Amino acid sequence: MGQKVHPLGFRLGVTQKHRSQWFAKPQEYSQLVLEDHFLREELNKRFPNSGIIDLFIQRKVDRTQVEVEIRTTRPGLLVGRKRQNCDKLKQLRDELQVELNKFRAKNGVSPTAKVALQVTTVQNKSSEAIVIAEFLVNQLERRIAFRRALRRVLSIIQRDRVQGAKIQVSGRLNGAEIARSEWIRTGRVPLQTLRADVDYCHREAKTIYGILGIKVWTFKGEIKPVRKAVEVPVA
């Protein structure tokens, strides 16, 4: 029986990069992984509907600074309008610093690392798999028929000219007694092409009939490798 590899892990180092980028000694590694997980959970808990796409975390070699880059489609919910950007960003940074210090003290680690925040705006949100998945979760939890929700998502994807998308919904669809899976696709979604910029997301919708699983793949285009010219010495 064939197995399906995770689309993002399959492309690490080609079109995808690691969400956490740092080096650590073996005895420090587990603590830093826990800190990264804590920061992600804290930000997603504080801003559940702010359109956060990705969180990239980098650390300096001497562990004095933690740099967190937040990619979001709705930066106004995170840092406010233009005049309030600096103040709200500083306030959010200070609050994260306090929570991180508490977490480190709880685990018996001295709170030395300072938090630095950067917010990046994502322009074409319809090509992001997490945006489509969360929209579908919202529709299905409001008891909208899954076919109508899928058609609505499909019209948005086609309107914004996304190159390709595939959506799969599994579970007791529309309250049926027997669970099943249904999917739709538009455009191209080349899952076996490494240079293809494919995004993927999995979410769960909690309905009165049970949990529905939602998987979304989006294709943003092919990233062609840059070929460097090689100088050949002339004899």
Swiss-Prot record:
S-S bridge residues: none
PROSITE patterns recorded: KH_TYPE_2, RIBOSOMAL_S3
Gene Ontology, cellular component aspect: chloroplast; cytosolic small ribosomal subunit
Primary location recorded for the protein, binned into one broad class: plastid
Protein location: Plastid, Chloroplast
Stretches assigned to the KH type-2 domain: 39-123
GO molecular function (one): structural constituent of ribosome
Keywords for the protein's UniProt record, in alphabetical order: Chloroplast, Plastid, Ribonucleoprotein, Ribosomal protein, RNA-binding, rRNA-binding
A biological-process GO annotation: translation
HAMAP family xref list: Ribosomal_uS3_B
Description of how the protein assembles with itself and partners: Part of the 30S ribosomal subunit.
Record-stated family: Belongs to the universal ribosomal protein uS3 family.
Matches recorded under PANTHER family: 30S/40S RIBOSOMAL PROTEIN S3, SMALL RIBOSOMAL SUBUNIT PROTEIN US3C
Name of the molecule in the record: Small ribosomal subunit protein uS3c
Taxonomic placement: Eukaryota, Viridiplantae, Chlorophyta, Ulvophyceae, Oltmannsiellopsidales
